[in-house]
Structure formats: C-alpha cells, structure tokens
C-alpha cells in the first residue's frame, strides 16, 4: 500500500500528466515536477492543517515553487468547511499573488478527468500556486481551446471562481505604494517649508 505522499506522486504522474483527448489534465504539471518546483507536505492532524496551509502559502515565493500540495488523511473536516476556509484565505493571499484551491475526495470528477487511477488512501488536499502565473497560463489555455470540453459548472467552479479574485489581486501592494508615496510627499513638503 502506498503512503499519502506516494499517492500524490502517482496521481500526478499517472493521472494529471497523462494526455486525454488532446491535453493532459494539467499541461504544466510534468514540467514543474521535473524542475523540482513542486513541494508535497503531509499534515498528520486535521487541527494543524490550516495553520500549516498559512505557513506554506506565506513561503511560496521564498522557495520559488510553482505548486505546494498539502494533504491530510485525518478526515475531520467537511468539504464545505474546507472550501469556506480556503475562500476566506484567498482574500488574504490573492493580494499577495498566491492562490489556494481545495480538493476533497467527494468532489465530482469531470468526464475529461476520469481514468483508471485510484488512491490507496483517503485524503483531502489544498493546492497553492502563484496567482498571476496561474491566470496567465489559464488565459493561454483558453486561447488554444483547452476548456472546450469542460462542463459549464466545472468551468464556473474552477476558472470563473479563481477569476473572481482578480478584483483583490495586488490591492495590498497598491495600498502600500499609495501610503509610501503619501509619506514621501508629506516628508518632502515639510522639508520645503523649513
């Protein structure tokens, strides 16, 4: 029997990277894995999971990663609760260019994602990725027809949901710049008056 980490690696190689009709489930997964830009973190206790998500989300760019996958097999959180937490955390992290996405065993699979692969373990995951890079890649995939076989519901639950965070992307940085510029102008103004 595989460990949870081995399940995730097998899922990536044997399922996510495999070509479907035209494209693999994630066209960028193999390159990121081969370039060691993917980190897998196994959290043993559910009550430590969200704290660990925050730690890893805060360190995404320090480690120059394309993807961090956190997983927990202690199934003491419901899919709705996990999704609510991740939605709230995205309001904190998307302005910092970091996007979080929850995945739960009970999530419905789209037809194009179905395959023979099965995990040995039951676990839920949170995937952490750079928001801007994900948006740019998604725009490219849109142009080449990648999403054409997706159902409207799945497209809305993934792509449109992520796009809904665009309005807050960069806001924290804009506010900081405005505050710094105000302080700089205020300081210069005081110096001129003296």
Cite the ranges covered by each PLM segment.
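Expand to "…catalyze enediolate/carbanion chemistry for C-C bond making/breaking, isomerization
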Residues: 1-194
